[in-house]
From Swiss-Prot:
Subcellular location: Endoplasmic reticulum membrane; Cell membrane
Segments on the Extracellular side according to the record's topology features: 70-91, 158-176, 225-248
Name of the protein: Aquaporin-1
SUPFAM superfamilies membership: Aquaporin-like (SSF81338)
Sequence segments annotated as region (Disordered): 1-34
Lineage: Eukaryota, Fungi, Dikarya, Ascomycota, Saccharomycotina
Note on domains (UniProt): Aquaporins contain two tandem repeats each containing three membrane-spanning domains and a pore-forming loop with the signature motif Asn-Pro-Ala (NPA).
Membrane-topology annotation of the record: Multi-pass membrane protein
Keywords for this protein: Cell membrane, Endoplasmic reticulum, Membrane, Repeat, Transmembrane, Transmembrane helix, Transport
Transmembrane segments: 49-69, 92-112, 137-157, 177-197, 204-224, 249-269
GO cellular component entries: endoplasmic reticulum membrane; plasma membrane
Superkingdom of origin organism: Eukaryota
Cytoplasmic side: 1-48, 113-136, 198-203, 270-327
Amino acid sequence: MSSNDSNDTDKQHTRLDPTGVDDAYIPPEQPETKHHRFKISRDTLRNHFIAAVGEFCGTFMFLWCAYVICNVANHDVALVAAPDGSHPGQLIMIAIGFGFSVMFSIWCFAGVSGGALNPAVSLSLCLARAVSPTRCVVMWVSQIVAGMAAGGAASAMTPGEVLFANSLGLGCSRTRGLFLEMFGTAILCLTVLMTAVEKRETNFMAALPIGISLFIAHVALTAYTGTGVNPARSLGAAVAARYFPHYHWIYWIGPLLGSILAWSVWQLLQILDYTTYVTAEKAASTKEKAQKKVKPAVPLLWLKSNFPLLFFISRSLALNVIIFGKN
């Protein structure tokens, strides 16, 4: 075996996969058996720990920033007389806070743990087989603990009561709230699947559309449900506020159903093998355009071929006009 082959083998043995896609990696010299996929090696435990730390730090950073911004936005005296009211300025501020917070948090920790930062997103990734079920459970625990920690930290660091907890408003019923949470989460999870899981040249920019989708979800839902779309966010805020409404379950069931709905749409596209047909259609269109040569119009060709004759005739006419004009 050459030295290069030896170095490659050493690199394979020490390879870690913090995103969880390659949890069950088996060294080449060990034949795979039915027991290997259930075996937990030291490197696998280390990978899970790295992912747990990444998800905790990313979720904490995201939710702490969002909670504080939401608290500032909701400390408006205009809401004292109308607690169910909603001001466009406040909605935009809250939406920007959550959208930009999740955007930079994903960019920071996507390379460490995948940057799900949301149990509903983690479920979609698990259903899409982007992460293993074990990694999904690890991410869930880290995200939920981070949500409670972020809620406690935001509550302790800011004066006044906690105003970032989720609650129904504008007369929204529990059933409507459930479906709003489901569809809002489905938009977010589908954005993750289509921009981060699908292999594209723009994968490195996935945090941008994900942040925009969360921004849009907050603009649409905040007045009605307070915009959960993230069980860790809803639980952390409820713990900080010590307020668990009897309909708190909609902030869990709704996002999880939305996660499954998003995966169903994504899975349908995979069954249809849309990438193959879209690529073939684009290639055919490009080939057709290349085969079409741009030809000048017929009048232009005639003028070009008869230019000397036309020049002689026009010159003769001009001279005749001049001669007759003098006469």
